[in-house]
A protein has these predicted regions:
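Conserved ABC transporter NBD signature motif
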Residues: 58-70, 322-336, 471
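Conserved ABC ATPase "signature" region
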Residues: 116-134, 369-384
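H-loop/switch region of ABC-family ATPase nucleotide-binding domains
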Residues: 198-199, 448-449
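Catalytic Walker B motif of ABC-type/P-loop ATPase nucleotide-binding domains
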Residues: 163-166, 413-416
């Protein structure tokens, strides 16, 4: 169904090939995972399959690529669209409508299906992706994970024979990732051919037929997921592969009371916020402490209020009620803005400069930066300093945004899904950097679905449910076990709120 034969591709303006002598066959009905570190060439391989290369990305190709017997370089993209459906890493790049129902039906309308068939497919797609409650919602009101799920539903409605998925789990919570695995398994049972670029392989366990490891554009080896399961932690860090299941074997004794941790904190006192007058509260926090000198995880399902809370804390929005208190009393929006730096969930919103170096220097303002080259080294950005940020992979863009936050020297650093698109080794490096920042007395908040990251570096965690604090406390093994179980189960009709544990 898909065949690469000695394919070498270099983007226009680049002398370094993104793929080198790449050969791979994917049979009809197979599920194959492309894996490897950020920037290794996974997305380039996908673009050669779905026609994005050469229709949207120019460059030179030697060797050949074939999809269902067609050469993507020789046929029109609309011809491939009837065969290949794609879910991109950033769902915003494939939205054309303003509401979810119109978005999911858009592809079917372009296929000129009759109204009744479109309605049937749309209902089926919402049901299969487990997002029936999002039908008819505004795209602009959705969380990042909800947007990704809608993007998947819009492709599913078109019933392509080949699915190309570019890190589809990157913005999803644990329950949604489990649901995604179920969806992909269902597609495979129906005979679809699936090519996935991923760092997280756990949800594909039992679904993927094999994993293909790419390093520096070259196919290094093919593995079963059982081979991945047997990999050591060091081998996963070298190859960028996540563990199949979250590891809880690290030293998780509470780090909150270790010597050197600051006792300063920002107190959220009866903080409430709603997006529209007369609407229900998107955030309703009775009491929560943000500790300086610690790394705090903000957890919860998609739409739980995590990003809304981070905006309130950073002074980007004004709460309808309540106060945020510092050492000297209430903190105004202006004061919180001055002391905070936010790395957004979609980092494309905050990349402005023509080079990586200028982007990071912009965040530093007039202040001097020490150790900038060391930061580039830690985040694997060496050699990319003069590249345009928008030319980088999703994981590399995320690393640039993290480097910019470090350069800002703000007291409160808020990272919204900082490991989205990051491979295992870069996640570990980000975790070490977050700990180092906290040791310097700053507050680090990590809004995340990534429990591997939480286990690696977080001192405290708060779990939000419908905008309120469900549980708060130090990160230890028992908390992680509870959090993973909670985030994987459906509590839409339950009342599980607990008192604060710290």
């Amino acid at each position: 169904m898909i065949e690469f034969s000695h394919a070498t591709f270099a983007y226009e303006g680049s002398s370094t090939p993104a793929l080198r002598d790449f050969s791979l066959c994917v049979g009809a009905g197979e599920c194959v995972v492309l894996c490897g570190k950020s920037g290794c060439g996974k997305s380039t391989a996908l673009r050669l399959v779905n026609g994005m290369i050469p229709n949207f990305y120019d460059g030179s190709l030697s060797g050949s690529v074939s999809v269902a017997g067609r050469d993507p370089f020789e046929c029109e993209i609309w011809e491939l669209a009837g065969i290949v459906g794609t879910v991109f890493q950033n769902p915003r790049t494939q939205f054309y409508a303003t509401d979810t129902t119109s978005e999911v039906s858009f592809g079917c309308e372009n296929m000129r299906l009759v109204r009744e068939e479109i309605a049937r497919r749309v209902d089926e797609a919402f049901a299969q992706t487990g997002i029936a409650e999002l039908k008819g919602r505004s795209i602009f009101e959705l969380s990042g994970g909800e947007k990704q799920a809608v993007a998947f539903a819009s492709v599913s409605a078109m019933s392509p024979s080949v699915y190309v998925l570019d890190e589809p789990s990157s913005n999803l919570d644990l329950r949604a990732i489990d649901a995604l695995g179920t969806i992909i398994a269902s597609l495979k049972r129906r005979g679809a051919t699936i090519l996935v670029a991923e760092h997280r392989l756990g949800y594909l366990d039992g679904v993927a037929d094999r994993a293909v490891l790419i390093e520096d554009g070259r196919l290094v080896c093919e593995m079963s997921l059982e081979d991945v399961r047997r990999m050591s932690r060091e081998d996963r860090a070298r190859t960028g592969l996540r563990p199949l299941r979250s590891e809880l074997s690290h030293d998780l004794e509470s780090r909150a009371m270790l010597p050197g941790k600051s006792t300063d904190r920002i107190v959220c006192d009866d903080v409430g916020f709603s997006y529209r007058k007369g609407a229900g509260l998107a955030l309703g926090i009775d009491r929560m402490d943000v500790r300086m000198g610690s790394v705090t995880a903000v957890l919860g399902r998609n739409g739980a209020g995590k990003s809304t809370f981070s905006r309130c804390l950073a002074g980007l929005v004004k709460p309808n009620r309540g106060k945020l208190l510092g050492r000297s009393g209430p903190l105004s929006e202006r004061e919180r803005l001055a002391m905070s730096y936010v790395v957004m969930q979609d980092v494309n919103h905050q990349l402005f400069c023509p080079s990586v170096r200028e982007e990071v220097l912009l965040s530093a303002g007039k202040g001097a930066i020490s150790g900038l080259e060391e930061v580039f080294g830690h985040l694997d950005l060496e050699g990319l300093e003069e590249r345009h940020p928008m030319s980088l992979s999703g994981g590399q863009k995320q690393s640039v945004a993290i480097a910019s936050a470090l350069a800002s020297s703000k007291k409160v650093l808020i990272f919204d899904e900082p490991t989205s698109g990051l491979d295992y080794s870069h996640m570990l490096e980000a975790a070490r950097l977050f700990q180092a920042i906290a040791e310097d007395g700053m507050a680090v908040l990590v809004v995340t679905h990534d429990m591997d990251l939480v286990a690696e570096c977080c001192d405290f965690a708060v779990v939000l449910e419908r905008g309120a604090v469900l549980r708060e406390g130090p990160v230890d093994a028992s908390f992680l076990v509870w959090a993973i179980q909670y985030l994987r189960r459906d509590t839409s009709n339950g009342n599980e709120r607990e008192g604060a544990t710290a």
